[in-house]
Amino acid sequence: MKKGIHPELKKARIVCACGAVYETLSTKEYMTVEICSKCHPFFTGQRKFVDTEGRVERFAKKYNWEIK
């Protein structure tokens, strides 16, 4: 590998909307995410919808679908 062409890695802090904080290495020092392994339905076993713009409600109304 060539020297001097790769970006410098820094300690990065990743914050989820649920409040979970992760630390890793990245070229950015701070990132936010809406969903992570602590709050994602696949990992938690719970069924819930994460909706930030009302898309799920519009879809449910359009197809007469009930949200649980």
UniProtKB/Swiss-Prot annotation:
Chain residues that bind Zn(2+): 16, 18, 36, 39
Cofactors required: Zn(2+)
Superkingdom to which the source organism belongs: Bacteria
Pfam families: Ribosomal_L31 (PF01197)
GO terms for biological process, alphabetical: translation
InterPro entries (alphabetical): Ribosomal_bL28/bL31-like_sf (IPR034704), Ribosomal_bL31 (IPR002150), Ribosomal_bL31_A (IPR027491), Ribosomal_bL31_sf (IPR042105)
Keywords, comma-separated and alphabetical: Metal-binding, Ribonucleoprotein, Ribosomal protein, RNA-binding, rRNA-binding, Zinc
PROSITE patterns cross-referenced by the UniProt entry: RIBOSOMAL_L31
Subunit and interaction comment: Part of the 50S ribosomal subunit.
Function: Binds the 23S rRNA.
Family: Belongs to the bacterial ribosomal protein bL31 family. Type A subfamily.
The protein's name in its UniProt record: Large ribosomal subunit protein bL31
Organism phylogeny: Bacteria, Pseudomonadati, Dictyoglomota, Dictyoglomia, Dictyoglomales
Name of the gene encoding the protein in the UniProt record: rpmE
